[in-house]
Amino acid sequence: AGVTSFKIEGRAKSAYYTATVTNAYRAALDAVKNGEPVPKWAVDEVYKVSHRQYCTGFYFNKDDANQYYENSGYIRECDFVGVIDSCENGRVNITQRNYFTVHDDLEVLSPGKTPVKLDIPYLINSKGEQTEIANRATEKMYFDYPVSFPPHSIIRKPLSK
């Protein structure tokens, strides 16, 4: 009798939520399978999606740990700001999702990889104009960058604590 599947709890989870959590779970499962500790970055990832306070639930069979009653609000540590559509000849083509600037600390989350920092030097908007600000949801933009990322990689902005 082994584990045959995992379920991500909740309804209507976003692409950002699903990508972040499944990437972290995959890294954790692979580590456990190989007899290694779960990587710290994978544990940290589940806190980077919008979530309510985590608890152990029924895991330790304690009556007082089954639910968390102090606050039912959501916690969010990162904003989902864009999707990488393609990378060709050093050019990264993106679709902007939420406001960001080239001065923001950004990260890229790609399937099966540890998230990496992204320092965007400038942006070219859909009118062909150079800008430092992405403030039109779903606008197609691009920038030149020495590293290539797979299509559908996610760009996020960690929020100040």
Annotate each predicted stretch with a short phrase.
Residues 1-161:
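Surface-exposed amphipathic alpha-helical tracts and adjacent flexible/coil segments at the periphery
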